[in-house]
Amino acid sequence: SLHDALPIFIEFAEEQKLNSDISFDAEMDRMIIVFDADIFEEKVKDFDEVVAFGENNNILGISNPAFELFLLLHYKDAYEKYIKPNEKEIISNEKVGNQRYIRNLFTQVSGINPKKNKSIGELVKQVDFAIVEECKINEDIHQCSGQVTCNIAKIINDIRNNKAI
């Protein structure tokens, strides 16, 4: 069944809504669940069904192939400089040494290992670049297969503008 195939992070989000320490108001609040689309291509066959289920009571932030794409968007002119010229490589996201292509590209651009360097949090100061740059790629999570996709900056912008549903 679909419920058996639900990724653990959606189940976790649903469980957290019931956590009395959080005081989640189902009428007013939405849980934001952020994940990489590439996990579906490997592990979950029913991507569209999972997205539909997840969107039912949550806001889904999806990056394809991986979260490092969102991080890369925090740099001025990231689309023209880094994403557009490497689009095929980003989507295939093959290993470069011991890292996937997008992580390696991000590390080259930023000088930061996103998994280990705490200074990664400083990128929040550049989120306005991410909002502008993300508009240049696909933001439709329903059409992300085979496309460089991210909608995380859009969610942040919607929250800023009180448009998040």
Language model feature labels by segment:
Residues E11-N19:
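Glycine-rich, highly charged phosphate/nucleotide-binding loops
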